[in-house]
């Protein structure tokens, strides 16, 4: 019976053809049922209810503050289940304002952080695979070109050891936007981890989005975030 499940896994992902170690000690029934390969291991990858195949919605700028009996919106709206979230209020940027100038309004920016941790063994992967074979781990994300600031998006992905703290490999991305010409679209971010050394057991995925409040609230959205483990690795050259 165990052999049948092992054969099913081999047939499903061509593990033997890719040179994946397949020890008999692995619970192949569990591997087949959890399906750890070629699927998104992140929970709730589109918390704003949008996807990158449709242009991001244009913001409605009325310029009218909320009624005095209603508190202003300071946090984004969405379903953030599966994500740990945090908001960091940034100081007002007064650079470039001459001394003595009377300021009526300044935009206030905030970083909104979403993060989650993927347990690779709970997802169905096994020690020999992660330590000896080291399959490719593909990261993808799409963020909205909101034009709220030159820095509106940050990505930080860490491959962690069994203690959930030791960083074995890390990828960060901190782009700067061109605000000279108006553009409002989705921007793709991607990275492939390979040859990352033995010991990886968790993936910590974090991205930060910059929001703005000035009379009204405007945010930067993100969508279709993914962490996918491939049943393959780069060929040796």
From Swiss-Prot:
Biological role stated in the UniProt entry: May promote cell proliferation.
Region called Disordered, residue ranges: 40-82
Pfam families: FBA
Compartments (UniProt record): Cytoplasm
Superkingdom, taxonomy of origin: Eukaryota
Organism, scientific name: Danio rerio (Zebrafish)
Keywords noted in UniProt: Cytoplasm
FBA domain sequence ranges: 31-231
Claim: DNA damage is one of the keywords in the record: no
Biased composition (Pro residues): 64-74
Name under which the protein is recorded: F-box only protein 50
Tissue expression summary: Expressed in nonspecific cytotoxic cells (NCC).
UniProt xrefs under InterPro entries: F-box-assoc_dom, F-box_only, Galactose-bd-like_sf
A Gene Ontology cellular-component term: cytoplasm
Entry's Gene Ontology BP terms: ERAD pathway; glycoprotein catabolic process; SCF-dependent proteasomal ubiquitin-dependent protein catabolic process
